[in-house]
């Protein structure tokens, strides 16, 4: 996959302040505040920064954690997993494989068939109808 590389100033000019804070500076939106937390429409969730398809809405589930949760990415190659030891915790950060946008974290407490919970910030994704 061809990487998209931009300066922080370029990202800042194309994203709104919250998207920039979360996607480029590894922030986190407040729990239960994101527009996709309770979303039930069908479609494909894309990276807000580069439009890469990330998650199929059919893999979304209600985890009760306050952020949209999915049990699998649309393709394993769409994500990069990075060990995250910030805030006194050991977690696995997930970023977009194309543009390195911070998306959220993945945890080993999800439903079958994967047992994974991709906990994703709503500001990092865009739900679009299937083609």
From Swiss-Prot:
Q: Does the keyword Oxidoreductase apply?
A: yes
Protein name as catalogued? Peptide methionine sulfoxide reductase MsrB
Which cysteines pair up through disulfides? They are none
Organism expressing this protein natively? Pseudomonas putida (strain GB-1)
An example GO BP is: response to oxidative stress
The UniProt keywords, alphabetically, are: Metal-binding, Oxidoreductase, Zinc
Which is an annotated GO molecular function term of this record? peptide-methionine (R)-S-oxide reductase activity
- Reactions mediated catalytically: L-methionyl-[protein] + [thioredoxin]-disulfide + H2O = L-methionyl-(R)-S-oxide-[protein] + [thioredoxin]-dithiol
- Please tell me which top-level EC class this enzyme sits in: oxidoreductase
- Listed GO CC annotations: cytoplasm
What is the active site of this protein? 119
- Which positions fall inside the MsrB domain? 8-130
Cofactors, names only? Zn(2+)
Per UniProt, Zn(2+) binds at 47, 50, 96, 99
